[in-house]
Design a protein with these regions (language model features):
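Conserved glycine-rich cofactor-binding loop
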Residues: 19-20
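The beta1-alpha1 cofactor-binding region of Rossmann-like NAD(H)/NADP(H)-dependent oxidoreductases
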Residues: 62-73, 106
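Substrate-binding pocket helix/loop in short-chain dehydrogenase/reductase
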Residues: 99-101, 105-111, 135
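Active-site helix of classical SDR
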Residues: 124, 159-162
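A short, exposed helix-loop element centered on a Lys and neighboring polar residues
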Residues: 124-125, 168
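SDR active-site lid
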Residues: 172, 176-243
Length: 300
């Protein structure tokens, strides 16, 4: 038997990385559907930005997903302010400068995984007691890079595959508690993070130009947010946008070896990767930099 539709009216939703990009768009969408939102972000300006979204139904908390204590404090603030917490959306994420693995410093790999993997687990862990008590929902923001070849951005792809596995495991662990787990997979989303990490990098643009055009279709943060909200209302297990990625995910066991073989023989792709090999090592943004540009936290 399928679960009943989930009415977002008056539900309290905590969103990490909610100051820009997908997080901010999701907050706006959920507010329009009657929810109360709690934005948890590393940016010190978060409380004021939350008030700008809605003076009554939005709350901002300064939190770093790498620090469990700050997330626990954000959950406590949410409950103190709104009296409950129904949904947690682990949206905060980090995208490093494109590079081959051998040209990526170990510190940069660790920084990416600290936010995109450990930070997601920290977020869920902090919120779970409240979410279980409300038989609510957990939302994890993965990416099509969970199943698409991650050449040139291996740490990011690794992290999103890990988020997918987190979602699968949580879905079973929380089944007896009446909690739903939604994993969202997005391709290129038109955010500041993608502008900096993709559009402003000519080598990355050249690499993308060698891929099938269907893979390059973009969506807006609002489209991603609508997918999340729709998924919550139906207690969906997964949301994939654009929709064309659904069959790719379902057929990944067949398609991935075929695509990997094609990519490994494509001279354009190999030449671009050689250029990534030869340029200066990648540098992951510092926490201060991500605070100044909050939309770098998350994505596709």
């Amino acid at each position: 038997m399928s679960r009943a539709a989930y009415d977002l009216a008056d539900k309290v939703v905590l969103i990490t990385g909610g100051n820009g990009g997908i997080g901010a768009a999701t907050a706006r969408t959920l507010l329009r559907r009657g929810a109360r939102v709690v934005i948890a972000d590393i940016d010190p300006a978060t409380p004021g930005r939350a008030t700008d979204l809605h003076p009554i139904h939005s709350l901002g908390c300064v939190a770093d997903v790498r620090d469990p204590a700050t997330l626990e404090a954000a959950v406590a603030q949410a409950v103190d302010h709104f009296g409950r917490l129904d949904v947690v959306i682990a949206n905060a994420g980090l995208l490093a400068k494109a590079a081959t693995l051998r040209n990526t410093p170990t510190a940069d790999i660790e920084a990416t995984l600290a936010v995109n993997v450990t930070g997601v687990a920290n977020t869920v862990t902090a919120a779970l007691p409240q979410v279980i008590a409300r038989q609510g929902q957990v939302v994890l923001i993965s990416s099509v890079f969970a199943f698409l070849n991650g050449m040139g951005t291996i740490p990011y792809a690794m992290s999103k595959a890990a988020v997918e596995q987190l979602g699968r495991g949580l879905r079973i662990e929380l089944a007896d508690h009446g909690v739903s787990v939604l994993t969202a997979y997005f391709s290129l989303v038109q955010t500041d993070m993608i502008a900096r990490g993709v559009d402003e990098d000519p080598v990355v643009m050249e690499l993308l130009g060698a891929l099938p055009k269907a893979m390059l279709k973009r969506i807006t943060p609002e489209q991603a947010a609508a997918g999340i909200a729709d998924g919550l209302e139906s207690r969906a297990v997964r949301v994939i946008r654009p929709n064309l990625w659904g069959p790719v995910s379902s057929l990944r066991g067949v398609l991935n070896p075929t695509l990997d073989t094609r990519f490994s023989r494509d001279r354009r792709i190999l030449d671009v990767l050689a250029r990534l090999d030869s340029r200066p090592a990648a540098v992951v943004p510092t926490p201060a930099a991500t605070s100044a540009a909050p939309s770098r936290r998350k994505k596709p």
